[in-house]
């Protein structure tokens, strides 16, 4: 019996590299088309036979984009070129999985040849995402979501047979824009438990940690206010995006580090904080849970979904609104939760549902169902 052929299209690694690896384990014939070099993809567990890297074909465009990193037009050119290049070289497949907004030509071509088209959408419906971001005062005089991005996203939604999304609030945003619910597949992202785990007896040098881009989108302006109000010690690990990092007592910044080093930073803190205003399901939250840090998240960070995936959901606190006072209140709750942990692993055996293996099995079950339905 021939294996089901699946092409996965992505500009970079993202979570779909993990998806490609897991679908290969589940018996599918997978090809991962991206500009990630094969050797780098293999470092994240992708088998060599799954990689269909177009790095060398894209190298001139990647180089130009790096030289002129602030040019939006060049970034759009790179996206369009990759879309067409992938469309020309990709093999025929039963299913194509593509990152939304990045690919339109290639999926359209694949659909003409009989492929089922699944788009991966990591954030809210593009119109809702634009509304949320435009409501942030910092973006009042700019366009946080360019019109061309909206156009390509909406084309993706029309072209899709299904859209895979990571959380309840993303699902609700599509419902608000009357997207057919039977074409939505909710599947929370996973975490690699070999990279993230509690380290016993490690000194807790910080009260609070946040990992990820330092930005208004992730609520970092609220973090600054809340840390000043509470006097807690704070560690940030990641890049600086659109908010200056405070150079004052109580605030420590570390730049971007290799994923395998992150566990040592998580374990130096007591609790994890992410009051994100708009994010599908921030994977750093699952990483923090795997390290057994009580979590403070938002209704728009995917934290509510994670509450349903641990044995002791009370150790995940959701901020009531996007104000510094609400973050302060949630921090107090989380700090009390930390004191009550007393060595317990609050995810319990349910941590298995937060792994990439579980994510891949849920996806495999979904694929087998829709492929069977197509044949009927």
Regions found by a protein language model. Give the residues of each.
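Short hydrophobic beta-strand element within catalytic cores of glycosyltransferases
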Residues: 294-299
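Acceptor-binding helix/loop patch of EC 2.4 sugar-transfer enzymes
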Residues: 61-73, 116-151
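A charged, aromatic-enriched C-terminal amphipathic alpha-helix characteristic of glycosyltransferases
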Residues: 339-370
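Short alpha-helical donor nucleotide-sugar binding micro-motif in glycosyltransferases
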Residues: 157, 264-269
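Membrane-proximal helix-turn-helix segments that form the acceptor-binding/catalytic region
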Residues: 83-92, 104-106, 125, 139-163
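Conserved donor-binding/catalytic core segment of Leloir-type glycosyltransferases
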Residues: 192, 199-218, 224-229, 235
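Aromatic "clamp/platform" in nucleotide-sugar-dependent glycosyltransferases that forms part
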Residues: 277
């Amino acid at each position: 019996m021939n294996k089901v052929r699946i092409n996965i299209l992505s500009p970079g690694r993202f979570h779909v590299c993990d998806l490609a690896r897991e679908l290969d384990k589940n018996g599918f014939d997978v090809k991962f088309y991206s500009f990630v070099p094969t050797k780098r993809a293999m470092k994240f567990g992708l088998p060599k036979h799954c990689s269909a890297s177009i790095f060398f074909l894209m190298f001139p465009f990647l180089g130009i984009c790096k030289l002129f990193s602030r040019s939006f037009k060049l970034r759009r050119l790179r996206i369009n070129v990759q879309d067409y290049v992938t469309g020309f070289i990709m093999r025929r497949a039963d299913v194509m999985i593509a990152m939304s907004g990045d690919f339109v030509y290639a999926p359209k071509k694949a659909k003409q040849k009989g492929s089922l088209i699944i788009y991966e959408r990591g954030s809210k419906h593009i119109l809702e995402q634009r509304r949320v971001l435009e409501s942030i005062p910092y973006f009042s005089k700019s366009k946080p979501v360019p019109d061309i991005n909206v156009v390509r996203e909406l084309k993706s939604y029309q072209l899709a047979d299904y859209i895979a999304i990571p959380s309840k609030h993303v699902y609700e945003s599509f419902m608000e824009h009357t997207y057919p619910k039977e074409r939505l597949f909710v599947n929370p992202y996973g975490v690699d438990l070999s990279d993230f785990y509690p380290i016993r007896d490690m000194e807790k040098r910080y009260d609070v940690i946040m990992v990820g881009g330092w930005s208004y989108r992730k609520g970092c302006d609220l973090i600054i206010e809340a840390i000043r109000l509470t006097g807690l010690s704070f560690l940030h690990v990641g890049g600086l995006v659109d908010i200056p990092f405070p150079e004052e007592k109580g605030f420590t910044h570390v730049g971007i580090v290799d994923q395998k080093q992150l566990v040592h930073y998580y374990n130096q803190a007591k609790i994890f904080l992410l009051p994100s205003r708009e994010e599908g399901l921030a994977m750093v939250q699952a990483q923090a849970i795997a390290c057994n840090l009580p979590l403070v998240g938002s209704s728009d960070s995917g934290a509510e979904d994670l509450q349903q995936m641990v044995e002791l959901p009370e150790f995940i606190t959701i901020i009531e609104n996007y104000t510094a006072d609400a973050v302060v209140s949630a921090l107090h709750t989380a700090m009390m939760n930390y004191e009550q942990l007393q060595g317990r692993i609050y995810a319990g055996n349910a941590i298995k549902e937060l792994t990439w293996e579980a994510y891949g099995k849920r996806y495999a079950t979904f694929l087998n169902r829709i492929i069977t339905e197509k044949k009927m």
